[in-house]
Amino acid sequence: MGGTGKLVEELTNLLNRVGVRICLNEDIKSVEHKNSIAYKAITSNGKEYFFDNIIFNGDPPTFYSEILKPKKRNLINPILPDSLMTYSMGLFVLFFGTNNQYKDIAHHTIWLSKRFKGLLNDIFKEKDLPDDFSLYLHRPTATDQTFAPEGCDSYYVLCPVPNLRSSINWKVEGDNLKNNIINELERTIMPNLKSKIKDLSYMTPIDFKNDYRSMH
């Protein structure tokens, strides 16, 4: 079946069939505009591409503050200065496989904290990393066994966290949150999880900023 990766593959095939040129492994360093029209993209290796229209499928604040040259006023909300703009939550993503199968775990599982309003307040307003959390657990092998070797499972966990306007040290808290999530999943719905885990990794809001150019 393939999931999102298969969707990207088929979209690529479609673009190729209709004659769209796809350039990979080239990071856009800047986009230049003239008379309020963006017309040129410059890559990190100095290549220049000229266009009639440019569509940026990323975080708009990053585009206007870091990529568009010369810099213009805040085009997202011209009235508010950047310092007064509000941003959504950050995200912690935990990826892991297991050398067994948890057949009672569905393809999609929502794992909720006992708190609701207080948890959201900590994340969005106070920008504190709470001791508790709510999770989305994804098990694609529930419907597509090709996502893992025979007899194994593949997972990722999404955990809402404060964005980078917080003072959280993710070099420390990343491992702490990873361990807390695993402990809670093992305690509640995935017995003996720690002894079954293989190929564990995670992403913090810093990774989303560095790898995907999110603003916060």
Task: Show which residues each predicted segment covers.
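Helical element adjacent to the flavin cofactor pocket in flavoenzyme catalytic cores
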Residues: 1-39
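A glycine-rich dinucleotide-binding beta-alpha-beta segment and adjacent secondary-structure elements
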Residues: 130-136, 191-216
